[in-house]
A protein has these predicted regions:
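Structured beta-strand-rich core segments of catalytic domains in phosphoester-bond hydrolases
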Residues: 27, 51-138
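Active-site beta-strand/loop signature of hydrolases that rely on acidic residues for catalysis
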Residues: 10-16, 34-59, 126, 137-138, ...
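Conserved beta strand-loop-helix elements of the APE1-like EEP
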Residues: 88-107, 235-240, 263-284, 310-311
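Membrane-interface helix-coil boundary segments and nearby low-complexity
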Residues: 1-13, 17, 315-318
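Acidic/histidine-rich helix-loop elements
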Residues: 13-30, 145-146
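Active-site environment of divalent metal-dependent phosphoester hydrolases
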Residues: 19, 53-58, 82-85, 92-93, ...
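Metal-dependent phosphoesterases centered on the DNase I-like endonuclease/exonuclease/phosphatase
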Residues: 155-269, 273, 280
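Metal-dependent phosphoester/phosphodiester hydrolase catalytic core
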Residues: 131-135, 140-150, 182
């Protein structure tokens, strides 16, 4: 992704698909594909989902390994003891982490981790000094199950990253596991319309797994009618956590569905569930949005990396 300015920052989110889950030759080869994909992005800050590990010590070691192999850093200074990897443990074995390039400095004691008791997976965030501006970056993985739980946990997420008033400008890279419900103003009519107007489930034959992502009712003949559930996405937008793709009016591009072996791909076809959301002070600083849709990225994971570019000098203060 070419930069629009030498002073801009690139922030990427990447679901790495069960990384480290199996120590087998095929998975070791795929790990290298993930590393090659990350290196090819040449990003400044990276949010990763699906670091697999049975315990915190192993998870931290694996995040350190990924950072080292990708040429990035991942530890935050503490007043006492060793620096701490920017990793939040998820209660179901899927963990989130943050990595950043040399030259970007984490603010001491700024690491925030939320997992068990907060989310189905987890949320990790760190305040980073990106060339004189202090900006909080976060990695999150939303629940794959429970539409109402997803909406409730999104409400909690909004509270954690937007409160109290005066918090640092924040960007959250995530596998949101939901359809975007952000609205944009139609220049012709002045109306607020859905940025993502096409329903990813439209035309798909009903399957039982759609209960996790769809609303449904029945017509007069008793035939089931289904549509994407937008509540969880609307909680984010209405709560002040904005989809960067929508804010930039970026061309729609899916991030999930290219892997024919994944049952989710058959369920929804192509779907845009990975993305970066930002608080209001970041909106005016956004410059570009990009989905890394390459043969390498498609082989490395069932999700495609998403990158946004922002200009620290253009960040607003609330």
């Amino acid at each position: 992704m070419p930069r629009t300015s030498p002073d801009s920052v690139l922030f990427t989110t990447y679901n790495t698909l069960n990384l480290f889950q199996e120590d087998t030759p095929p998975e070791r080869d795929r790990y290298q594909l993930v590393v090659d994909t990350i290196r090819g992005l040449d990003t400044d800050v990276l949010a990763v989902q699906e670091i697999r590990a049975p315990d915190e010590r192993t998870a931290q070691q694996r995040l350190r390994q990924l950072a080292g192999d990708a040429g990035l850093r991942c530890t935050v200074p503490r007043p006492e003891g060793d620096d701490q990897p920017a990793l939040a443990m998820g209660p179901h074995g899927y963990h989130c982490g943050l990595l950043w390039r040399e030259g970007i400095e984490p603010l001491p004691c700024s690491l925030r981790c939320h997992g068990t008791g907060y989310f189905w997976h987890s949320l990790v965030s760190v305040a980073l000094d990106v060339g004189g501006a202090q900006v909080r970056h976060a990695a999150h993985h939303a629940t794959p199950f429970g539409r109402r739980m997803r909406a409730d946990q999104n409400e909690l997420l909004v509270g954690l990253v937007t409160r109290p008033p005066g918090v640092l400008p924040t960007l959250v890279g995530a596998d949101w596991n939901t359809t975007c419900a952000d609205r944009v103003r139609d220049e012709a009519t002045g109306k607020w319309v859905l940025y993502e107007s096409a329903d990813p489930f439209a035309g798909a034959e009903w399957s039982s797994s759609m209960i996790f992502h769809c609303e449904w009712d029945y017509d007069e003949a008793g035939q089931r009618r289904h549509r994407a559930d937008l509540e969880a996405g609307d909680v984010l937008w209405s709560g002040g956590l904005y989809d960067a793709a929508a804010a930039l009016r970026a061309p729609w591009h899916p991030t999930f569905g290219h892997s024919p072996a994944d049952p989710g791909a058959a369920r929804a076809g192509w779907w845009r569930i990975d993305g970066i959301r930002v608080t209001r002070p970041v909106l005016g600083a956004l410059r570009a949005h990009h989905v890394e849709d390459t043969a390498l990225a498609r082989r490395a994971s069932d999700h495609l990396p998403v990158t946004v570019e922002y200009a620290p000098a253009a960040l607003a203060r609330e």
